[in-house]
Amino acid sequence: MPDQIIPEGFVRQTRGSPLTDPWEPIYQKQTPEAIILGLWLAKPHTNARGFVHGGLIAALTDKAMGHSCGRQLRGAVSLVTVSMAIDFISSAQIGQWLTVETDVIKTGSTICFAQCFVKADGAVIARANATFRVVKKK
């Protein structure tokens, strides 16, 4: 949305995918520990009732947690989602700024654990946790 200001520290994401391309623009903010994703909610992000779609939340939480684990592992490996759980706490609507804020719990040579909170205008609307399998790049 052209009239909406992108919060400080956020830039266009550097790793798109065929799944998330229709939802662009998606932004990212790098911290020493993680990658925070953000976007202004628009009609393509919603369900038939005008609320943010759970599938969007699931995809963005998977992406944010996976990229954050990869950042901590210095990008030397690939990650595959083994399991993920999401609790939908509240809803979000068109025009709100959505962020996915990740905390990497533990990384190892074969597995990585992460959790995140999804916020709309700063209010928590979902939480998720995931386990990723660490795979050596070929």
What residue ranges belong to the model's regions?
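Terminal targeting signals and extreme-terminal segments of soluble enzymes
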Residues: M1-K138
